Amino acid sequence: MITHLNVTSIYVLDKDEALDFYVNKMGLEKGSDVKQGDYRWLTVRVPGDASTEISLETPGAPLHDEQTGEVMRGLVTKGAMGGLVFLTDDIHGLFETLKEQLLPSEALYP
C-alpha cells in the first residue's frame, strides 16, 4: 500500500542555477547532493520536512537519449514541463518576499 510521496522530479536546464534559485530565492533547503560518475542526484525540500524531496533533473544523458533531451530542453525553456504547488500560512507575505527577490515590478504591473 502506498503511504507517502517521497520524491518528485522537475526538469531544469542547469542544476546549480536551479539550486541557487530554490534555496536563495524560494527559501527551500538543499537535500541530497551525490555525484555518481556523470550523474548528479540533487534535491531540495521545504525546510524542516525531510519526508518529501524535489529532484532537480536535467534533460539528456544519462536519463534520455540526445534527441529526447533536446526536445525536453526546448519544453523546459518554454515552461511546459510541469510545476510545483506549495502551501503557505501567509500568502501575502510570501507574495511580497517573492516580488522583491524574483520579479521586476514591470513584470507584475505593466
Which role fits each region the language model picked out?
Residues M1-N6, E29-P110:
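Vicinal oxygen chelate
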Residues S9-K15:
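Conserved beta-strand-loop-alpha-helix junction that forms the acyl-donor binding cleft
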Residues E17-A18, G93:
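Short Gly/charged-rich anion-binding patches and loops
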Residues A18-V23, L98:
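Conserved active-site tyrosine of GNAT-family acetyltransferases
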